[in-house]
């Protein structure tokens, strides 16, 4: 069932806001705060009985009593409203209170009938589903009042400014006083008891505006027209008309006071406290005018009322023959005047009965049979009841005609106001019909709130605890079933078999009820029978039941009506049964059964809201609370079971399709800019929406076809988010546009500042933070490890060079050569370290080593003096797959142990200042396969099969570093284990400060990391030629003339017919054509790799692009085909300057630049000193990281090969549009790239001196790896594994 909506938002189509209070200030219309607001009325009991700590009937009764005594008559059970009749005006239906419930969900306000109306109206608009409000309870519990308040609220909030819609609203409200006057009466239990049932359907257009209405009438208690018990009254209209009729009506229709008529005076109750018949009559006339009844129609209605009153005054006496005789002949004469018939016909119809005999289907003799006084009184009353009943039906039909919608309706809201359950001392056919309809309504409540709900949970496979309840279907079947025959069927059979004699028919019915004795809810007791209804046991009197069930007029009465000249009276009796028809006319029981089933069908097609009314006492006292009577009502209304189902169940459910359609805006995975983007099925989309909105998993369940939400608060939150979506989108657009206009210059400055400050080391910081995660707070830290400027630079010895695969500094190249690693092996980490070396018979000592980590192995290099020469050799190579664990102590020392599987040698014990960084790179290269052990005692293999331990202890006497002695390391206390790196020191702020406080832009670039742009490719345009190093200032070679340019120009000129223009004057010198640099291959370069250019010795090629990052590869062009070739295989062909075209003097050849000698150490580009612990080396340069991309065929989750220094690499792009080739970043990087390019050109020149004989194979230059990507840069490194 649909539940109402979001919190706080007003609805579209709102008429207007309520006017400000009297205390509103003149400034902006804001009401002044009132101290009284802090003293709110104390709440009695709980407003929602699902919150009761103990769910029993007695606890429910106690809670209702507390609230009733505190003038709080409304209480919730979930979305069901419980209303206790206060029998007084509490002042809670004013316009201000009505407006306070507008646009609010039921949890925001105290319980009220207006909240139910608001929920129904909102759900109709939001979900485009028909709604109905079912009001049930016993007579006098306040059902009619609740229905009036529902209509009052809907008319007030439903919007619509044109006159047609306002007319519909006025007519809907006018139906209440009009139908109350004709359909309600004062009873012992209720001063305004509905003696009929009505179902009002208000029809709305697509905008939620009322465009029409329709009323369905159910079973008017017409017997009340002629008979009432003591201290009850006839229908209100009789007292209103007799007391307040105009002089014209009194004169024309002979109207006197109510005491003058038998039908109004016999019960001896002419006046009622709290009822003003004069005022009510004026309201009735106003309602007639609003509905659109003409003056003639109103006169005819009052004429029929007067006729009924005068018919009641026809009194009988018994003549000598024992037949009925009218005591006052003037009365039937006046009745004849009012009905516009012959007076003799009236007398005959009221004292005689015409009987016809038939033989073989033919008409026989006609007899006039006189009636005795009892029979005559029955005929008189039958005429009065028929006129009033048909007139009431005509009024309802006339109302529907006036409210008939002029356009097509989209949805309806139905309000059911029907007579309550009745138990009297003498219960007859009317009570049977009324209680039957109430049983049907109770069955609907059970079907929708108890039975159907539990069946739906089972079908949808929802976790659920079954609740026991009483299903009254067995009682409904007892009354309405045909097979086995129920009470209505037994009545029909009795009427058919003994139709002439009512007493014989009643006896036949008593005999037939014996067949129902097997039903446990039925008990036959002579001339009476008992039915155990859901609301209690009722004893019914059989006498007169069959006659009331036939509900047929005598032929004499119908003939009298037919003879009338009043057209209105003719309209009241449109259909006359065909006497020749063999089909049995429908009985009253048939009609009420058909009406009840049609009502149930209509209600089942709508989404119901429930109002359960309770009568607090039988005396209509505003202060009396009859606990026993209310406890009985609580039980038969099933409030306890309703609370249990509500507490255990789900407040809202809907199909996946409708759920997605309603709430897809709330998830970025299912919508974009208001468009539905989900590609999966509706179930997965629904689940995604509920997950993305942050709803706790226990708050919802997914069924087979529907999604279930447990609490209404969750649904209200969803509705609130949905209502705010478009509002937030509009605000975001407005805010973004204002920010663009107001802060675009500041944004540019912030981007520049951020880029300058962070371009160098963002990735190094990320790697450093991952190192903290690796230690996981298990090891004390050194103070220098936590410095804000500390970065994990990786290749401190520059073994990997610019791309991590060679070409670094001289020392780095020497170390790489010493390891013997393959050309494509990328270096991730290199540093100086110390290895613990054991000595025979003495304690082990630390010995200096070089430590290199690649994507394949760990290399330990040692420098020794061999034959009086310093030699660096690879002491040990350990494959990464062989390392099982890395051991670290929990103190601040710098020792680590590499545990190697199945090694013949001892596990290396290393002392390295960058131990955390080394472990971090190890984990990245092995995808976290290496176990990191942190302990104060580390185990290692001293040799194969022999284990040893090295222990660590604190010693505050050790002032610096740590001390090793006899398998024990002593070290002082360090920083706490949970320490993290300190923030980098802030630079001194510039003179220009932003005008904002830093809230406009978020630090660190875009908020969504997924939106980070990919590096752009460098366009393949010919770069500016790099300067060549020489002994002095570097000179720039003049470009040679393009091959074939002259002939091409001649060819073009030859095709023209115009004469050649005259030559230029001799003094002018024409500019030379641009030359293309040509290079000659010094060696054979054989390759089959895609994108590479195979070269033979002495091949001449053109260089179209030189990689400025120093990777050693150039893009060359040979015979129109481009490809990559190593730059150290090429030599520049120096060409003489071409002869100027217009110069008369012979050309002057420019001498080729002097070939440089072999590059000496002084001529090499300066290499920054390697960082040493403690700052021993000065001028530490922080290089930029270049990470190797995943090779073809590699594992997709394999970590990047290395993060090493590269002074020539382009900056890493951290903001959109920066760091691209040719941009600001390229200008910054150009200076750093010049040295690498110059070194490559110098090497080519040196090789040119002896090109006649290629060097030995061993002397052939090593081919550098190709640039990664078209711009020579690799993709950014993946985030560290967490």
UniProtKB/Swiss-Prot annotation:
Q: Which GO terms describe its biological process?
A: actin cortical patch assembly; actin cortical patch localization; actin filament organization; endocytosis; mitotic cytokinesis
Feature: compositional bias, Low complexity: 1029-1058, 1252-1269
Q: Which InterPro entries match?
A: Fungal_myosin-I_SH3, Kinesin_motor_dom_sf, Myosin_head_motor_dom-like, Myosin_TH1, MYSc_Myo1, P-loop_NTPase, SH3-like_dom_sf, SH3_domain
Q: Where is the composition biased (Pro residues)?
A: 1059-1068
Q: Name one GO cellular component term.
A: actin cortical patch
Report if keyword Membrane is assigned: no
Q: Where is this region: Actin-binding?
A: 412-494
Q: Where is this region: Disordered?
A: 1-30, 569-590, 973-1073, 1237-1282
Q: Which domain of life is it from?
A: Eukaryota
- Residues making up the signal peptide according to the UniProt record: none
Protein function:
Type-I myosin implicated in the organization of the actin cytoskeleton. Required for proper actin cytoskeleton polarization. At the cell cortex, assembles in patch-like structures together with proteins from the actin-polymerizing machinery and promotes actin assembly. Functions as actin nucleation-promoting factor (NPF) for the Arp2/3 complex.
Would you tell me the protein name for this molecule?
Myosin-1
The record lists the organism as Mycosarcoma maydis (Corn smut fungus)
Q: What is the lineage of its organism?
A: Eukaryota, Fungi, Dikarya, Basidiomycota, Ustilaginomycotina
